[in-house]
């Protein structure tokens, strides 16, 4: 289980976009794409077969997962994430929790 998944609210803790907040759009192994963060301009060649117009486009590039931290909604600060096992009706389930206060993420 990954500590950061799609849909999490995160804050950038290192790099040129330090302090910016956003929502995780994609997780790519050790990298994540965050909405509105690490935006770059790229030159796009036109491709009429695919219906792609040419020009300069802006797109979000991946950030290393070590440069972001999940945002705790209770404290509105960056927090560390842990994983613990919870037993419910004989089934063991892995859940993520905030290390600062122990509250379960997404519950």
Swiss-Prot record:
GO BP terms, alphabetized: translation
Alphabetically, the GO molecular function entries are: rRNA binding; structural constituent of ribosome
Superkingdom assignment:
Bacteria
Q: Which UniProt keywords apply?
A: Ribonucleoprotein, Ribosomal protein, RNA-binding, rRNA-binding
Instruction: Give yes or no: UniProt keyword GTP-binding.
Output: no
What InterPro entries has UniProt attached to this entry? KOW, Rib_uL2_dom2, Ribosomal_uL24, Ribosomal_uL24_CS, Ribosomal_uL24_KOW, Translation_prot_SH3-like_sf
Which SUPFAM superfamilies does the entry mention?
A: Translation proteins SH3-like domain
Write down any Gene Ontology CC term.
ribosome
> Is the keyword Cell cycle assigned to this protein?
no
Instruction: Please describe what this protein does.
Output: One of two assembly initiator proteins, it binds directly to the 5'-end of the 23S rRNA, where it nucleates assembly of the 50S subunit.
Give the similarity note.
Belongs to the universal ribosomal protein uL24 family.
Describe, as the record does, how this protein assembles with itself and its partners: Part of the 50S ribosomal subunit.
Which PANTHER family does the UniProt record give? Answer: MITOCHONDRIAL RIBOSOMAL PROTEIN L24
Q: What is this protein called?
A: Large ribosomal subunit protein uL24
Provenance organism: Neisseria gonorrhoeae (strain ATCC 700825 / FA 1090)
The gene coding this protein = rplX
């Amino acid at each position: 289980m990954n500590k950061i998944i799609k849909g999490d609210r995160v804050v950038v803790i290192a790099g040129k976009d330090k302090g910016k907040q956003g929502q995780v759009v994609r997780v790519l192994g050790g990298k994540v794409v965050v909405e509105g963060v690490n935006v770059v301009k790229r030159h796009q060649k036109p491709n009429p077969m695919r219906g792609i117009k040419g020009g300069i486009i802006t797109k979000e590039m991946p950030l290393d997962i070590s440069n972001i931290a999940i945002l705790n909604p209770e404290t509105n600060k960056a927090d560390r994430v842990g994983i613990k096992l919870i037993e419910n009706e004989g089934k063991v389930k892995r859940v993520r929790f905030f290390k600062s206060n122990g509250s379960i993420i997404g519950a």
